[in-house]
Amino acid sequence: MKSIRRGDGLNVVPFIDIMLVLLAIVLSISTFIAQGKIKVSLPNAKNAEKSQPNDQKVVVISVDEHDNIFVDDKPTNLEALSAVVKQTDPKTLIDLKSDKSSRFETFISIMDILKEHNHENFSISTQAQ
């Protein structure tokens, strides 16, 4: 009669080691992804205030140097932006990031849309000098 050896089985320790390394990589990379992807060179301001982080939902409207408009890093146009602002709760903060090389007309168009929909809770991002 054959004897059954105990101890034969799958060694999971190397698998756990690999999973921990992958977890560390994912966590370190995810901090870089959280940053905005649209490159916007903000205008300088001497009296710029540092924004206070809070748990409030923020909708970010970005305008790049070629006057392309983005809502939360997704490309859009003025008509679609108007629909987004209309659907957004008036208490939700809208952060406007306009590139210093973009046309002022685009900035004013966005401000008109905010005013049209009575959305007064917004901030304009600048870079401290």
Swiss-Prot record:
For the biological process aspect of GO, one term held by this record is: protein transport
* Descriptive protein name: Biopolymer transport protein ExbD
* Major subcellular location class: membrane
Instruction: Spell out the subunit comment.
Output: The accessory proteins ExbB and ExbD seem to form a complex with TonB.
Q: How does it sit in the membrane?
A: Single-pass type II membrane protein
What is one cellular component GO term in this UniProt entry? Answer: plasma membrane
- InterPro entries assigned to the protein according to its UniProt record, in alphabetical order: ExbD, TonB_ExbD_2
Where along the sequence do coiled-coil regions lie? none
What is the purpose of this protein?
Involved in the TonB-dependent energy-dependent transport of various receptor-bound substrates.
Q: Origin organism of this chain? A: Helicobacter pylori (strain J99 / ATCC 700824)
Which sequence ranges are marked TM in the entry?
13-33
Q: Please give the superkingdom of this protein's source.
A: Bacteria
Q: In the UniProt record, what gene is named as encoding this protein?
A: exbD
Listed A to Z, the keywords are: Cell inner membrane, Cell membrane, Membrane, Protein transport, Transmembrane, Transmembrane helix, Transport
GO MF annotation terms = transmembrane transporter activity
Q: Which residues lie on this side of the membrane: Cytoplasmic?
A: 1-12
Compartments annotated for it: namely: Cell inner membrane
Question: Family, per the entry?
Answer: Belongs to the ExbD/TolR family.
Query: Which residues lie toward the Periplasmic compartment?
Result: 34-129
